[in-house]
Amino acid sequence: MKHIILCIHFLLMVVGLGQAQDCSVAPNMRVNCGYPTVTEADCRAVGCCFDSSILNTKWCFYNATAGPIKKLECSGDPTKRIDCGFPRITEKQCILRGCCFDSSISGVKWCYARTVITTPAPDTTTASTTAETTTVPTTPETTTVPTTPETTTVPTTPETTTVPTTPETTTVPTTPETTTVPTTPETTTVPTTPETTTVPTTPETTTVPTTPETTTVPTTPETTTVPTTPETTTASTTAETTTVPTTPETTTEPTTTPTTDTTPPTLPPTPETTTETTTETTTETTTETTTETTTETTTAPPPECAADRVDCGYSGITQADCEGKGCIFDSTIPETKWCFYTEAEAPARKAECTVDPSVRTDCGYPGITDKECREKGCCYDECIPDVIWCFEKAVPVVNS
């Protein structure tokens, strides 16, 4: 029995050393398992390895067994990728959905579904058979006395202990079949997000109704000054109340209208027709003037100028954060920049970030996001692969 116990301890030590060395992956062979700024606790919680001792490498990565399989799941023809995200999705959001993220190739989907790999299954069975053959010859021939070799109790225990442990742990690659996420992109069809965030109606509602209502209130004292003719027609009194306040606000030309209203008080039908026309014209003029004033201050440029927008925010920025930086927010035009600088400030901002990609000065760290880079006051451009995306702004040259 002592020999059997020693054999079991020896096997457990071998398995433990194998698992401890499972994370010994060369830095250039590591397969990313996390997202930018992932913590060690979050990385190990999903069963991945974490090593931050080597700079400019992947800190959260798959172990030596799962790494090659995960790499195959995210490889393949970029033109045949199946979308797994939504416009402007971040790398963290994509990986948390169980999808692959690769922004090194432009013009293709960056967040896409994994490919199901079914080849690793036979490899696990061969590994388990070798483990059985190596463990059996250790004890029975050297330690058993001729009285008890016929019982052959030794080979039974290693077979029961070694067979279920190793293949079950190594057959984990079957789980990607459960996490093939082509169903989630169908449910989260992205056109919902721009519709919910399109709030171009708010500036119109806040500015228009306040001013005209306050100006029309003083019309009531005019009705009290003309108590002599209300018995003839009530419509004439309403005509006076509507025409008087509108003329001083819009223009001084409509001063001729009160003379025409006062001269024919004896004809009741005519003021009814005139009041209807005047009320329509006054409401049109007031709304036109108010909308003109608001569009000059807050509205975005027309669609034909959308290509000239200079980005002022980051992926997923909200309207409140964008306007808090003093920039303009307009989400009505898809496939354009929604948060951008004003027309006066755009040329200077564009010149600051117009730097030759080969001479860019690094301003961030590996895996930095668009938001984190811009919050540091740096430029961010991920359109060109294999260059620095977060870089220092160019110093403008002042002409003396």
Swiss-Prot record:
Expressed in which tissues: Expressed and stored exclusively in mature mucous glands of the skin.
Annotated signal peptide: 1-20
Primary location class: secreted
Region feature 7 X 4 AA repeats of E-T-T-T, mapped onto this chain: 272-299
GO biological process per UniProt: maintenance of gastrointestinal epithelium
Keywords: Disulfide bond, Glycoprotein, Repeat, Secreted, Signal
The Sequence repeat ranges on this chain: 127-135, 136-144, 145-153, 154-162, 163-171, 172-180, 181-189, 190-198, 199-207, 208-216, 217-225, 226-234, 235-243, 244-252, 253-261, 272-275, 276-279, 280-283, 284-287, 288-291, 292-295, 296-299
Places the protein is found: Secreted
Domain P-type: residue ranges: 21-64, 72-115, 298-343, 351-394
PANTHER family xrefs: INTEGUMENTARY MUCIN A.1, INTESTINAL TREFOIL FACTOR-RELATED
Function: Could be involved in defense against microbial infections. Protects the epithelia from external environment.
Protein name in the entry: Integumentary mucin A.1
Native organism: Xenopus laevis (African clawed frog)
